[in-house]
Amino acid sequence: MSPSPRQRSTSHRKPLPTVTWRQGVHLVGSALWCDALRAHGLCFVSSVRAIPRARKRAGTLLTTQTTLSLLSALHRAPEGAQLLSPLRRPFFWGSLRLELFANSDLPGSASLWVKLPSEERVIVAGQPSEQSSELLEPLQLRQAETLVIAAPWAPLHQELPTLDEMAHSVRSERALAQAMGVPLLVRCSSVVKLAELVGTLDLGPLKLHVDLHRAWQWCQSLPRFPKLHSVSARTVAPGEVLWWPHAAPPPKLPVTPRELHLADGLSRAGLVRYARASGVRQVYLTAGFSSEVAAALSAHKISAAPLGPPQQLALFGELAAP
């Protein structure tokens, strides 16, 4: 006997997604959120990037001690309960098996590996970086079926510029700014990238956005971190360099500066390498989705889709799959 139309439609129904967006990444059927914008039951925070401004509560905060300390230095640490975990130390939270592991992005930053009661495994990666630094733990990998990740520079770069190439860009742009009689605004969100660059540049005292300045001061106690003087600044003289995070509103300068954006995280090829090495079949991008990124993953039979608030999804365009 052939199945009824109702039976046929049920048998071909797509499985429900493992993750969804609910003011942050939410693991469906659980009380676990990741890098969420509001307070929830248990909220994993991958790095200081995930809490861009101060807020009162974030539910029970799951993160590393280093990230919490850096959040406090930036005046962004939420109030409430905390569940601090070292890296590479699996534990159970209810029916979920969890593990934090290094993503080589910022001091204290981590990715989260989750094993669901269904045995399905999910990685919430944050914004990992494969550009190694002696200031951070090397990038680590775990195996999973689903990956949630931010790779904002993947649509623009097949491979990210090297540190030497970035330093050359800063020197060249500064020379042009000096010739034009304007400041140079360097957009850089990573205090680690900044530390590696200034070691190769002769810029004098660092003039930094207040958040970069606070992070820089906090990092002075870390081993091997460069001991260079920095000041919090909102303006600089023509020909000088002002370092500014990507997400911060531009400073109000007397003249329009030259502007240079420094990439970090994963390139398009780096994202493909990360996904393949993790064995995933589905990738959700909280930043960095594009048709080119989806096609690069699709070539390896990995589906890709954007994950974020509705206004963000409109920018991403249509989801793509192999």
PLM regions: where:
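Short hydrophobic/aromatic-enriched beta-strand-loop microsegments
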Residues: L62-Q65, G80-S85, G204-H213, K301-P310
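His/Asp/Glu-rich metal-coordinating catalytic cores
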Residues: T10-R38, L42, V48-L185, V192
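Short, charged/polar "capping" segments at the starts of alpha-helices
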Residues: R53, L68-A73, L156, L194-E196, ...
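Conserved beta-strand termini and adjacent loop/short-helix elements that scaffold enzyme active sites
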Residues: D35-L37, L84-L87, F101-N103, H209-H213, ...
